[in-house]
Amino acid sequence: MAPLRFSANLSWLFPELSGLPARVRAAGSSGFEAVEVAWPYAETPEALARAAREAGLRLVLINTPPGDQEKGEMGLGAVPGRQAAFREGLEQAVRYAKALGCPRIHLMAGRVPQGADRIAVKAEMEAVFLENLRHAAGVLAQEDLVGLLEPINTRITDPQYFLDTPQQAAAILQKVGRPNLQLQMDIFHWQIMDGNLTGNIREFLPIVGHVQVAQVPGRGEPSSPGELNFPYLFQLLEDEGYKGFVGCEYQPRGDTVEGLSWLRSYWDRRGHPEAGQ
């Protein structure tokens, strides 16, 4: 079984450094082979591509733009009346992905509108999401890109987020029926919403295109105190044949590099994947 491949989420790691290029360089110096970032749009794609190239890293995941965060938006994919803005954001994400050689884009679903009842608007929001996802699948297919759907927990992190369980996301993916749309499995969110990680990983891994990890409930390093047994979960992913990247999307409890001792231990035990795997 091949060792897992890890990517540094630069929206979370190396907060002690200012600017994405500096964080890219730090990730390379720390042994990562890949990075991911939610929203790279404050930097030019040329600057990011140059930093990644100099650090010998690949960029493997970005998100679609969040929309108007001052108005509380956190993605637009399922938000009624924001279809045009979603498509504009998708075009921007595709431009960045192409310039950066990034193969995956997280298509953010967005939040239930302020003051609306989740149950009352669920059908309308799902219809909007399906419409936008079908459009996105076509756009992404033309560029050989993959779109990802990520359930985000509504118990702690974002009570208004529309897409909050792997079951809901898998059902939507089945309705869209496009092979270049896949599931993004953030183990932090899945544990909070449903638990049953062994069963859910085995059930949904065939449609998973990217994995992210953080400890529960504090969202710290996998080695920090919490509910999750990451040596077991990493072994499970290996045993199930997962070949994608595992994104380190957590809040370092102190210095980022010192907090990567868990990853250095994994590499010492399992080795780095061969380049190009």
Swiss-Prot record:
Q: Does the keyword Isomerase apply?
A: yes
Its EC number is 5.3.1.22
Q: Which top-level group of life is the source organism from?
A: Eukaryota
Q: Does the keyword Isomerase apply?
A: yes
Residues of the active site are E150 (proton donor/acceptor), E249 (proton donor/acceptor)
Q: Which SUPFAM superfamilies does the record associate with it?
A: Xylose isomerase-like
Enzyme class comes to: isomerase
The protein's annotated catalytic reaction(s) are:
3-hydroxypyruvate = 2-hydroxy-3-oxopropanoate
Q: Which GO terms describe its molecular function?
A: hydroxypyruvate isomerase activity
Q: Which family does it belong to?
A: Belongs to the hyi family.
**The protein's name in its UniProt record:** Putative hydroxypyruvate isomerase
Q: Which organism is it from?
A: Homo sapiens (Human)
